[in-house]
């Protein structure tokens, strides 16, 4: 499949607790399968086979997978030394054979001098440039004043105090966010970090850091309720025994309406997805998501910046300093990679390309996702949020593309966590109104210190003919989370011979048979 689609598949798998090792080897098999199918197109690949190029040089597992799929032995495999530069070596060798009858125009000093001015000349000849983000320093200063960001650190609580709070957890596609919300709906503390493919490990670190920090402050935390949302909503809810959980669209809409009660349009751009939510008179009237492809989302610009060694916090500053921003349009990410390579070849500087990518994200939203031609339909109060809008260059690109001045929260990346904290607060207040003794089911911050889990992939379900291959994540308190099952029976992990288990499966079967068959 397309690499962007594959990445969109991988993120939920990691957030559901599937082992990184399983995802990694599956990725190698996917690359080998696509390469063999695309290049051979049904023709037999006969040994010996030579493997060259960077990925096959530095990833011996990928070579092993290719050998398995091609059915060739070690003796039929050739992996040259320094195979990543084999083509360049061939180019050097060709000078003595293919081009030995042609004059050599290379002159060390003159050629190097020409190379110094090559970028400017090539850039002027080949590419159309976009406009800078600002006309002058004053316009830039006004923009920054218009859209302030909250400080990175939260205020320290009073020593000896006691806080009643609600904990909101947004286990997103690429990042994990936590917020502590007071009873009067003020954000007291938070956590924001990359998942790194280990959402449970990051969650444990976040909870332990919170516990340590408030212990150091001499402040007691009374957590009145916990809610989860995001890609890892179900997994995290099971892990921490959350009181409430819901889909991220609902959480984001609630957070935006809390910030701006008369909001007319909400745009959330995360690491792997986009959400466009239309609101009229406080009621959600339409929701549009990017269908399957994550092209143009936050992880694309992050991946490109990382490849250039650019820290995330420096992206906007670099983009704002671009003198000749690239025009990359709203193409598919895979094709855009080709455009970026062309831009680099034509002499564009990293800041010009970064600026072009920031603009392409917004173009992609309006041309490929929400497909709005008349911008008046967005209404007068537009809220933009999500981790991608922490990037001022993306926010400025939105302003320039739409001609609107949107409302960006001071903490745009934490809006999902804020939304679920608000919803959890309302849920728990409703429960306590019915029963004043109602308590949270949260495991507690102290239990988080000893929190552990065990992944067991490839667990075959025996309760029907589907024989689903499940991954069972078992937590330290004995509870478990199951993924890979196609029906409720797959969630049963107890001994199949136990009478109670048989009774449970029979009840599930009864409920499933009670559902009308609409096909017959």
Regions found by a protein language model. Name each.
Residues 23-47, 144-155, 209, 213, ...:
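Phosphate/ATP-binding catalytic cores across multiple sugar-kinase/actin-like superfamilies
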Residues 30, 40-69, 80-84, 231-232, ...:
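Glycine-rich phosphate-binding loops at beta-strand->alpha-helix junctions
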């Amino acid at each position: 499949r397309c690499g962007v689609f594959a990445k969109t598949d991988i993120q939920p798998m990691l957030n559901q607790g599937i082992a990184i090792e399983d995802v990694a080897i599956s990725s190698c098999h996917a690359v080998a399968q696509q390469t063999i199918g695309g290049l051979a197109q049904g023709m037999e690949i006969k040994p010996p086979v030579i493997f060259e190029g960077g990925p096959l040089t530095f990833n011996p597992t990928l070579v092993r997978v290719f050998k398995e799929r091609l059915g060739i032995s070690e003796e039929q495999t050739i992996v040259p030394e320094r195979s990543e530069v084999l083509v360049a070596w061939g180019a050097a060798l060709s000078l003595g054979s293919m081009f030995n009858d042609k004059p050599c125009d290379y002159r060390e000093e003159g050629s190097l001098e020409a190379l110094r001015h090559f970028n400017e000349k090539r850039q002027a000849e080949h590419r159309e440039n976009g406009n800078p983000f600002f006309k002058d320093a004053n316009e830039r200063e006004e923009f920054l004043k218009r859209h302030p960001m909250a400080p990175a650190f939260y205020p320290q609580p009073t020593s000896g105090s006691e806080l009643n709070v609600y904990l909101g957890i947004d286990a997103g596609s690429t990042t994990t966010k936590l917020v502590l919300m007071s009873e009067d709906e003020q954000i007291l503390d938070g956590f924001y970090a990359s998942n790194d493919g280990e959402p449970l490990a990051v969650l444990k670190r976040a909870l332990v850091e919170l516990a340590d920090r408030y212990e150091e402050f001499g402040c007691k935390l009374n957590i009145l309720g916990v809610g989860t949302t995001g890609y890892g909503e179900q997994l995290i809810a099971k892990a921490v025994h959350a009181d409430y959980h819901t889909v991220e669209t609902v959480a984001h809409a609630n957070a935006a309406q809390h910030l701006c009660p008369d909001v007319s349009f909400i745009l959330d751009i995360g690491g792997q997805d986009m959400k466009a939510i239309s609101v009229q008179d406080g009621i959600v009237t339409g929701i549009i998501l990017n269908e399957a492809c994550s092209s143009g989302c936050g992880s694309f610009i992050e991946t490109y910046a990382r490849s250039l060694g650019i820290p995330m916090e420096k992206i906007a500053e670099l983009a704002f300093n671009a003198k000749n921003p690239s025009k990359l349009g709203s193409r598919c990410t895979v094709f855009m990679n080709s455009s970026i390579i062309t831009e680099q070849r034509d002499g564009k500087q990293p800041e010009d390309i970064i600026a072009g990518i920031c603009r392409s994200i917004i173009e992609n939203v309006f041309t490929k996702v929400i497909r709005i031609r008349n911008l008046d339909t967005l209404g007068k109060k537009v809220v933009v949020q999500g981790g991608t809008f922490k990037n001022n260059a993306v926010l400025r690109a939105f302003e320039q593309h739409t001609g609107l001045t949107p409302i960006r929260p001071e903490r745009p990346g934490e809006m999902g966590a804020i939304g679920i904290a608000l919803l959890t607060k309302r849920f728990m207040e409703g429960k306590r109104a019915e029963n004043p003794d109602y308590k949270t089911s949260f495991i507690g911050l102290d239990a988080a210190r000893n929190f552990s889990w065990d992944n067991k992939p490839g667990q075959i379900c025996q309760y029907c003919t589907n024989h689903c291959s499940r991954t069972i994540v078992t937590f330290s308190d004995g509870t478990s989370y199951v993924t890979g099952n196609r029906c409720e029976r797959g969630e049963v992990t107890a001994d199949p011979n136990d009478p109670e288990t048989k009774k449970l499966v029979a009840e599930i079967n009864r409920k499933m048979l009670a559902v009308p068959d609409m096909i017959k």
